[in-house]
Amino acid sequence: MYSGAGPVLVPPTTTPPLPMPAYTFKPPPRPDFGTSGRTIKLQANVFEMDIPKIEIYHYDIDIKPEKCPRRVNREIVEHMVQHFKAQIFGDRKPVFDGRKNLYTAMPLPIARDKQVELEVTLPGEGKDRIFKVAIKWMACVSLQALHDALSGRLPNVPFETVQALDVVMRHLPSMRYTPVGRSFFTASEGCANPLGGGREVWFGFHQSVRPSLWKMMLNIDVSATAFYKAQPVIEFMCEVLDFKSIEEQQKPLTDSQRVKFTKEIKGLKVEITHCGQMKRKYRVCNVTRRPASHQTFPLQQESGQTVECTVAQYFKDRHKLVLRYPHLPCLQVGQEQKHTYLPLEVCNIVAGQRCIKKLTDNQTSTMIRATARSAPDRQEEISKLMRSASFNTDPFVREFGIMVKDDMTDVTGRVLQPPSILYGGRSKAIATPVQGVWDMRNKQFHTGIEIKVWAIACFAPQRQCTEVHLKTFTEQLRKISRDAGMPIQGQPCFCKYAQGADSVEPMFRHLKNTYTGLQLVVVILPGKTPVYAEVKRVGDTVLGMATQCVQMKNVQRTTPQTLSNLCLKINVKLGGVNNILLPQGRPPVFQQPVIFLGADVTHPPAGDGKKPSIAAVVGSMDAHPNRYCATVRVQQHRQEIIQDLSAMVRELLIQFYKSTRFKPTRIIFYRDGVSEGQFQQVLHHELLAIREACIKLEKDYQPGITFIVVQKRHHTRLFCTDRNERVGKSGNIPAGTTVDTKITHPSEFDFYLCSHAGIQGTSRPSHYHVLWDDNRFSSDELQILTYQLCHTYVRCTRSVSIPAPAYYAHLVAFRARYHLVDKEHDSAEGSHTSGQSNGRDQQALAKAVQVHQDTLRTMYFA
């Protein structure tokens, strides 16, 4: 064993050669199936598909004019199939993906080298619309090849076959419901689920076709998302601006009200109500500064002369409509340069528009309450969904000879043994997790830090957070910290009240200059405030000071639990070690120096086209592994590949060497946030980048790399078959449940692991897919290692849903978002959404996320 310093007892094995050029990068085959742990009977929300061994015929569809929404394209193709039934389609039931791809079970009478051009008329509101559709043969898609791949006779699952089956299974639901990604939604009949702010919850289902061992599977899950409520724009505005009714708004909107309203309605579709049956639709591009009574536009008169006319006057003259709310602004619709204005009162929000903007905190918690289902309830809902979807009577599914089993798939899983957790102090107590949780009572940190110089800065109002509150809080914190083995010696050297984000930097500078050896500043916040972002910006990036924020409510009323959680974070930020995995129980990979890397890229919220994406990579710095260092970069908007990975990994390897005096012989890389479609691209770029980082350090330095993608955003759920196995109020699967058969990839190395105890709703197991493995892990070794790493997250005494390095990478990227916040922009929404980084050049952004030298080697993100 190596302990972070001292000799390596086990000689390193010979390291594998560099991989061949990029085109040969291929995920490794599954080495074996795991056997560790006790078996557990489960059901998974995937349904076996019976696929015939036929050929499917693939045609390319080209619709002119282009760029119609998928819904319109589907209508065009449906009309085309009906209209040209006699000449071309006969009794065939083609399926269409809404873009370019059409599939049939029998070939169409179209020569392979010819293109057929048809004219299709869609009846429209007001006038008919005419489209030109060109059809040409593309390929035969062999379902036999799919069978061969699933049974292992062919190396790769043919992507085009899976895609064709997906289109077949989605064709009818796409016509019945509102498709969003791989899910389908419909407005809840009879029972609205309002979220506030003009938004509501729509329920639906996720559906996707997935290859697994021997069989194709249909993955079905319940799904929910936020849509905009179909309602008059006036009512929408009242919800957004928190007016009880429009009657209380007799004055024009203030600037801040108008800005807030514009932010919400911009980009939405509205339909007009003042032209009888012709409910023409427009997209909102802006909200006018001036009210309808004053907003003018150039009106061309019959004489050919152009005059400036107000919107209110125009509606009175042209539509005989006297506006009820001429003091309110207008919507500017269509193209901005065309000056088309509509009064709010003649517009409705069009139904079926999904909300892609970020939900507020209140909306998010309402959404969670509305959608959380215990595991047995979710299982029942999915079974109901399957019955109502009735795939086996779907005429399009039957056309292709596909059958789907009605029952969920039975799977045998295994519950892995949790690791033992070692504490410090005199007792060197050992904790054994039960259902993913353990207790720190009567235990002391493995390495506790003694705090001698510390300060309190209270940004909560003195009348709410009194000096008595602060005194009690200080006493209680000192007591709990002493019990935990992190003694806080004496009273704070400084304890003062302050107000607003602007006072953070001057106060912190004063503290740093006045109190030598200051270790920690505890900052008390009055709820959600821009002060938090500024504290972290100044502490992490400007002055290099350790800060711990505490909400005012936790100071007014202290509990041992919250104080204990605070101590977990403080000890780690100051360089302590809370606990470690019991060395005797760790997997064999620890016998040589090994570095664990976690990587994640976070993107700005949908609908934001300017803010950069943030890439974070963390690396373990000891043998436990407990301490981590972070690197972070800003990169191109929505860029998933980590652009500067080579330099980031190089930094971490140098830091590892400085901390341990060892060069890692193995690199275990947990990569979060990559979807299946990006596997090849990410593997190619990032594996080479890691290799490059090693070679740049030393020409012959070639540690073995294992590259694992961690996925949380999937729809596979596991349920206990035996009621007695269910855990907790939500009836979930036990922590440690692992599955690597039947519902996993037919040939590649992947597995599901639910490492945490589900508290609310249905547990989501994490999916791990090994894209590269020089270290030749067995299934048991990698599954046990991954599960143990889920127990090393420092913020709590429970196992978490993904390995600690991947979790830390997420925290680092999230913290960098705060570092980018401009302190002068306050925001009611909460600090991390306020006036960020727009228009700042790349260099300034890179500098903004650069952590201070004194903070660099600490776990400031904990």
Swiss-Prot record:
Disordered: region residues: 825-847
SUPFAM superfamilies: PAZ domain, Ribonuclease H-like
Domain Piwi stretches: 520-821
GO BP annotation list: miRNA-mediated gene silencing by inhibition of translation; miRNA-mediated gene silencing by mRNA destabilization; negative regulation of translational initiation; positive regulation of nuclear-transcribed mRNA catabolic process, deadenylation-dependent decay; positive regulation of nuclear-transcribed mRNA poly(A) tail shortening; pre-miRNA processing; regulation of DNA-templated transcription; regulatory ncRNA-mediated gene silencing
Keyword Hydrolase (UniProt): yes
Subunit field text: Component of the RISC loading complex (RLC), or micro-RNA (miRNA) loading complex (miRLC), which is composed of dicer1, ago2 and tarbp2. Note that the trimeric RLC/miRLC is also referred to as RISC.
Domain notes: The Piwi domain may perform RNA cleavage by a mechanism similar to that of RNase H. However, while RNase H utilizes a triad of Asp-Asp-Glu (DDE) for metal ion coordination, this protein appears to utilize a triad of Asp-Asp-His (DDH).
Official protein name in the record: Protein argonaute-2
Organism this protein belongs to: Xenopus laevis
Taxonomic lineage: Eukaryota, Metazoa, Chordata, Craniata, Vertebrata
